[in-house]
A protein has these predicted regions:
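Conserved class I S-adenosyl-L-methionine
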Residues: 66-71, 95-114
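Conserved SAM/SAH-binding beta-strand->alpha-helix loop
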Residues: 16
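Short beta-strand element of Class I
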Residues: 1, 8-11
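Conserved SAM-binding loop
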Residues: 12, 37, 96
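Class I S-adenosyl-L-methionine
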Residues: 109-176
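A short SAM/SAH-binding and catalytic strip from SAM-dependent methyltransferases
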Residues: 54-75
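A short glycine-rich, Lys/Arg-flanked "PGG" loop and its adjoining helix->strand segment in the class I
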Residues: 74-93
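S-adenosyl-L-methionine
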Residues: 23-59
Length: 176
């Protein structure tokens, strides 16, 4: 995206440096001055952005955290939406591209529960043939998933003006 849109900044955020390596290498080789990377835990993201500083978020093939009790780690969980709400501009979009049906449905449910505005909702984005930019940009992982004949889903939404409601933590039962 940084190649095509020179007048905007793009910042990749991940805790694992190896996932950002290729992008950083390309940005250096092509002298893309509008591309940067943060190797941080996502829970610390508020340290790096001021209120209203971010125009848009792209969440591309994140860990879906499918094991029991791990949904709170999904990047579209209300606790993260509440964080994003603190630095996104009003009306800014959050975009999720994933091969995980569970994460996709979780996100749809969360978006509905939080009264977010849905701009685009696409199941199996490649079902009707080639897709337009920027959805046509494929990551390494997306290529692997497509080779496995997995369906790629996409949702784009905006957060509501009212604060995101974070559900209470579930108590463990019987010492579990």
């Amino acid at each position: 995206m940084g190649r095509q849109i020179k007048d905007k900044n793009f910042i990749g955020v991940d805790v694992k440096g190896n996932r950002m390596y290729n992008g950083a290498k390309i940005a250096l080789q092509e002298q893309l001055t509008n591309v940067g990377f943060l190797r941080i835990q996502i829970g610390n993201i508020l340290t790096y952005f001021a209120p209203g500083e971010v125009d848009e978020i792209w969440i591309i093939f994140p860990d879906p955290f499918l094991r029991d009790g791990k949904a709170k780690n999904r990047l579209t969980h209300p606790k993260f939406l509440a964080m994003y709400q603190q630095f996104l501009k009003p009306g800014a979009r959050i975009n999720l591209k994933t091969d995980s049906p569970e994460l996709f449905q979780f996100t749809i449910d969360t978006v509905q529960e939080q009264a977010c505005k849905v701009h685009t909702l696409q199941h199996d984005i490649y079902a009707k043939g080639p897709v337009e930019w920027p959805l046509s940009i494929q990551t390494y992982y997306e290529g692997l998933h497509l080779a496995d004949n997995r369906k790629i889903n996409f949702i784009s939404f905006s957060l509501p003006d009212k604060p995101i409601v974070i559900p209470p933590k579930k108590k463990k039962e019987d010492g579990q």
